[in-house]
Regions:
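Hydrophobic transmembrane helix module of multi-pass membrane transport proteins
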Residues: 4, 105-237, 242-243, 448
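Alpha-helical transmembrane segments of multi-pass membrane transport and lipid-handling proteins
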Residues: 2-5, 36, 43, 75-76, ...
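Interhelical loop/hinge segments that connect adjacent transmembrane helices in multipass membrane
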Residues: 4, 9-20, 24, 158-161, ...
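Short runs within selected transmembrane alpha-helices of multi-pass transporters and secretion channels
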Residues: 38-42, 46, 65-72, 76-84, ...
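Signature of the first transmembrane helix
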Residues: 2-9, 20-80, 172, 229-255, ...
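Helix-loop junctions and terminal segments of transmembrane helices
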Residues: 46-47, 75-91, 264, 268-306, ...
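Transmembrane helical elements of multi-pass membrane transporters/channels
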Residues: 26-42, 167, 187-203, 207, ...
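Membrane-proximal transmembrane or re-entrant/amphipathic helices at the cytosolic face
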Residues: 1-15, 444-497
Length: 497
């Protein structure tokens, strides 16, 4: 390690000490906890907000917020993944501060440009609810100040997740205290925007020692622009093809079908947040390992990751598919019973997205294979468009769900094709087979119960308990038989108590 400035060295020493105590599993726990918290909290607050604000004001908020978020998205460019990767590579270097400031200068400049454009849009083009639109500009300032990518690159997940969870709890409390009628929409916007604003200042406080005083180097900043733009392409492509389903459903089918799809999609997004968290945590670790030439250690982590992610993916996917007939009418009401088919179809995409997430976040991006990543996402977007065009008019929301499965499958295959000569795909795919088999046996066991079950909560709980017991038992037997490293470590730790 080169000679670091004293404050930066102090932070780095703290980081090294915490890395010894806080391993990857702990980081994953923090990130999964946050992802689940962030997904579940809106489900808790939604009934209150919808009653207090009403449908019209909620629509105004949703539209203005979405637009502001897109301006912010363009301001961030591809810094989330790119900045994370670069900080991971340089966190032991004496120029860590310079690396940060040169990347942040691009982010700040782009975000400032988007902020000015948004203010211009608000002044000259927004007629109704202009004040609300102006207040939502806080979200673009949030993008301007967002340095979570730096702390992720330093593997400081405890700080980022704890900070974000505290702020979300405070904003939720403020909403319950201050929002009482549709006339409080402005207060609601200020609370939600102010919350993320406070969160960013807390992250800056945590990072202040490592980043040091502002140091700007125009040449270095300009060198970051092209790779940031390259990694921005998949951000836009993913954003488009995740929205495409809803846009095409709204145009080619009924509003009811759109409602069914959106309801089912929220459950899938909540379930897959576990997989997303895994990739977020592992990406900086894998980047550091590969940049230091520790290829064998990196591939060891990948094998463990594939086993962990696919164990979860098959459990979630086939678990949802098995209980969907009872879950849909119990959770949403009998009018949403047909959501069971949509939920089941979307669940089939989870193993594809899980495996692709490991390949993308733990190999493609850490090794700078941005072109392969972009091609795979574009192929997914195009295939989603074609599948939706053919299927939505015939099957409605179910067609959109099948289009998502096809798109996720093609993205997964394309990413596997890109790394086929670099890693042993067969070794990783073989790890998934036992979990797939355990999932199918679980599904068969639950289906036996489903034939006699009636739509009640006790029967749903019985199905979940039986399915979970079967899957966990079979998976643990396999992991024990193969002497899985993580399981053996936990058993050894438990036996010493």
């Amino acid at each position: 390690m080169g000679l670091l400035p004293k404050k930066q060295l102090d932070f780095h020493r703290k980081d090294e000490r915490s890395t010894k105590k806080t391993n990857v599993v702990t980081n994953i726990f923090y990130q999964i906890s946050y992802e689940l918290f962030a997904m579940l909290l809106p489900l808790f607050t939604a009934p209150f907000i919808s009653r207090m604000l009403g449908a019209d004001m909620l629509g105004v908020y949703s539209y203005s917020r979405t637009l502001a978020i897109y301006f912010g998205l363009f301001g961030m460019l591809g810094v989330k993944n790119y900045g994370n990767r670069e900080i991971s590579r340089h966190r032991d270097d004496k120029d860590l501060g310079l690396c940060f400031w040169s990347i942040y200068a691009v982010q700040f400049s782009a975000s400032l440009a988007m902020f000015i454009l948004y203010i211009g849009y608000t002044i000259f083009f927004v007629v109704d609810n202009q004040v609300i639109a102006a207040v939502q500009s806080i979200l673009i300032v949030d993008s301007m100040l967002d340095i979570s990518w730096f702390l992720f690159g330093m593997e400081q997940f405890k700080k980022t997740t704890t900070c974000s969870m505290i702020v979300k709890l405070l904003t939720t409390a403020a909403v319950f205290l201050l929002v009482r009628n549709p006339g409080d929409l402005l207060e609601y916007c200020l609370i939600m925007g102010g919350g993320v604003f406070i969160n960013q200042f807390m992250l800056w406080y945590y990072a202040r020692q490592a980043i040091g005083k502002p140091v700007f180097n125009l040449k270095r900043s300009l060198a970051h622009v092209k790779p940031m733009l390259i990694l921005f392409i998949p951000v836009i492509a993913v954003s488009l093809y995740t929205m495409m389903d809803k846009l095409m459903l709204g145009a080619m089918s009924t509003k009811a079908q759109l409602g069914f799809y959106e309801a089912a999609e929220k459950i899938i997004l909540c379930a897959t947040s576990v997989i997303t968290a895994f990739g977020t945590v592992m990406m900086p670790r894998m980047t550091k390992l590969f940049s230091d030439g520790n290829v064998n250690e990196g591939q060891r982590y990948m094998k463990l990751s594939v086993e962990a992610v696919m164990a979860g993916a098959f459990a979630i996917s086939l678990g949802i598919l098995s209980v969907s007939r009872l879950f849909a009418p119990i959770f949403w009401g009998k009018d949403f019973a047909s959501c069971a088919y949509i939920l089941s179809a979307l669940a089939l995409s989870i193993p594809f997205s899980g495996f692709a997430n490991v390949i993308r976040m733990q190999y493609l991006i850490p090794n700078g294979m941005d072109h392969a990543y972009i091609v795979s996402v574009i192929l997914g977007a195009v295939s989603n468009l074609i599948a939706n065009s053919l299927l939505i008019s015939i099957y409605g929301a179910l067609g959109a769900a099948l289009g998502t499965v096809i798109a996720e499958g093609i993205v997964c295959v394309a990413q596997c094709f890109a790394v086929r000569k670099r890693i042993s795909l067969r070794k990783y795919l073989n790890c998934t087979v036992p979990f797939g088999a355990a999932g199918l046996i679980m599904a068969a066991a639950v289906r036996v119960i489903d034939h006699v079950a009636i739509v009640t909560i006790p029967w749903l709980l019985i199905e979940i308990f039986v399915g979970g017991s079967v899957y966990c038992s079979l998976s643990l037997l396999y992991l024990y038989y193969t002497r899985n490293e993580l399981l053996m470590a936990e058993i050894q730790k438990f036996s010493k108590r």
